[in-house]
Amino acid sequence: MTAPLKTFDPIIVDVALGERAYDIVIGRGVLASLGQRIAALRPGVRTAIVTDRTVAAHWLKPTEAILAEAGIPSSTIVVEEGEGSKTYAGLEKVSEALIAAKIERNDLVIALGGGVVGDLAGFAAAILRRGVNFVQVPTSLLAQVDSSVGGKTGINSPQGKNLLGAFHQPVLVIADTAVLDTLSPRQFRAGYAEVAKYGLLGDAGFFTWLEANHADIVTGGAAREHAVATSCRAKAAIVARDERETGDRALLNLGHTFGHALEAITGFSDRLFHGEGVAVGMVLAAQFSAELGMLPPDDVTRIERHLAAVGLPTHLQDIAGFAQEGIGDADRLLALMAQDKKVKRGKLTFILMEAIGRAVIAKDVDPARVRDFLQAKLHRRG
């Protein structure tokens, strides 16, 4: 069990969605304020904590104690760690446990974990009794800067990533950066890919800052809070403009069309974490943009060098078991991309780049051009 730190001067980011607006509370030790904040938001509620075994070992007892101190009763549902829980079976397990715990519409589901737990618990909350409120307590860097914000919830299908889900906004997000100290180096690096994404899609100055400060972020220095807060502000602004992804919220999928296909082709396994797939996907998107004459080659080099400096995979050949299970099959990758949520009337849509800090939505991309590009990348490094 890990004891929560006391919080000092948290950063508050508002997700401005009218009656469904909520705060993202960021800082070292902010987990300690969870009970007080829930009591102020929803007096008299009961809660159900959904978490995974790894997170539970560090943070379940402290979280239960924080809730109890505020007079908030809680029950617990523990799932297995990893994408293997984001399935029909995983959803059934969580949903039935919530029903057995008699969680009512006015109660709260608390997602205590990384992106998998947040997506799974949020989707269960969305469909339970046609909508139960939930709180995100993200415990991974990826979840703190991306998946906990914006209301996307869901599970995977054998045919693709996040193909079943709902938009269901949390009522509160508690992003305690001290919790990130318990992540493995690989897990932390995977989340960093989503941080870099915000610089690439809309903030060149932030990307330049990341190039200079990534070591301090990784080691837990003061730069970490700034990186998380800047990322959350960027996402909150986009979500406030386009909650349902009918416009520029799609820009947040930079690297994800390639990345999701790579996750699917590796079986949603530990061979490729989501953030690692995004890292490779962003490099592929940059390279494809350059091939189309949209992005200067020097920008591609900067992107590759920065992600590699953090320790992220940047090429298809960096994926464990690259030569196995059809990873080297351009047609299979293209077929998986055809299941991407951005596909409209069977036409592929990609998020590409015109410069570092300027991403664009490219509609009706020629599949033959994508196939030729992938085929070339599969047979050479770089």
UniProtKB/Swiss-Prot annotation:
Pathway: Metabolic intermediate biosynthesis; chorismate biosynthesis; chorismate from D-erythrose 4-phosphate and phosphoenolpyruvate: step 2/7. GO terms for molecular function: 3-dehydroquinate synthase activity; metal ion binding; nucleotide binding. It comes from the Bacteria. Zn(2+) binds at E194, H256, H274. InterPro entries: Dehydroquinate_synthase (IPR050071), DHQ_synth_AroB (IPR016037), DHQ_synth_fam (IPR030963), DHQS/DOIS_N (IPR030960), DHQS_C (IPR056179). CDD domains: DHQS. Its main location: cytoplasm. Its EC number is 4.2.3.4. One of its GO terms (biological process) is aromatic amino acid family biosynthetic process. It is an enzyme of class 4 (lyase). Its cofactor is Co(2+); Zn(2+); NAD(+). NAD(+) binds at residues 81-86, 115-119, 139-140, 152, 161. It catalyses: 7-phospho-2-dehydro-3-deoxy-D-arabino-heptonate = 3-dehydroquinate + phosphate. Binds 1 divalent metal cation per subunit. Can use either Co(2+) or Zn(2+). One of its GO terms (cellular component) is cytoplasm. It is found in: Cytoplasm. Keywords: Amino-acid biosynthesis, Aromatic amino acid biosynthesis, Cobalt, Cytoplasm, Lyase, Metal-binding, NAD, Nucleotide-binding, Zinc. HAMAP family: DHQ_synthase. Catalyzes the conversion of 3-deoxy-D-arabino-heptulosonate 7-phosphate (DAHP) to dehydroquinate (DHQ). PANTHER family: 3-DEHYDROQUINATE SYNTHASE, 3-DEHYDROQUINATE SYNTHASE, CHLOROPLASTIC. Belongs to the sugar phosphate cyclases superfamily. Dehydroquinate synthase family. This is 3-dehydroquinate synthase. The lineage of its organism: Bacteria, Pseudomonadati, Pseudomonadota, Alphaproteobacteria, Hyphomicrobiales.
